[in-house]
Amino acid sequence: MKKIINFALYDFANSAFTTIVITFIFSTYFAKEIAPNPVLGQSYWGWTIGITGIVVAIIGPLLGSFADKKNYTEFFIKIFTIICISLTCLLWFSKPSEKYLLYTLLIVGLANIFYELSLIFYNSILKKISETKNLGKSSGFSFALGYLGGIIVLIICITIFIDNDTLPFGLSKENSENVRATSIVVALWYLIFAIPFLFNLKEINNNK
């Protein structure tokens, strides 16, 4: 059960990235404040995410095959997670100006690629920690915890950073500091709640 919980906590952790960056707060910020206009912003964002999906579809199977042969699953999960978190931090520098359009799309695109690649190897571990008859329950538990994590971090970001007149840490709404700070929240959330899984990954992967 401990392995299942640690596994699910990773879902709880990484849901912050898709919820805040890809789907809600940062995508809206990009469309309204960085792109020339919201319509173009949504289009650019959608194309970027679509392209990352194609990239992952191409290189994912190749990396998967390599990982199986060289036993690199553990390494890939850790390194891709760290890269995604690091890139997410860089979104703090995405100021509300068209000058940061390409920068933001590049960072988001790369972060999403490494996020999706980490999931390929993460999902492959489930069969090692759960009996075949319980795969559905284990997967469902992980999905539910991930969904819960996304809701919680969204509420935190909205109440503390977006719809709050008294911002923490000396932040101001000038230059959208409050919105950009949510990228740091995501990175910290992702890192902190992924630690139990990452630190026990060798044991989990070896199914000891």
Please report, for each region that a protein language model flagged, where it lies by residue.
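Membrane-embedded alpha-helical bundles of multi-pass transporters/translocases
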Residues: 2-202, 207
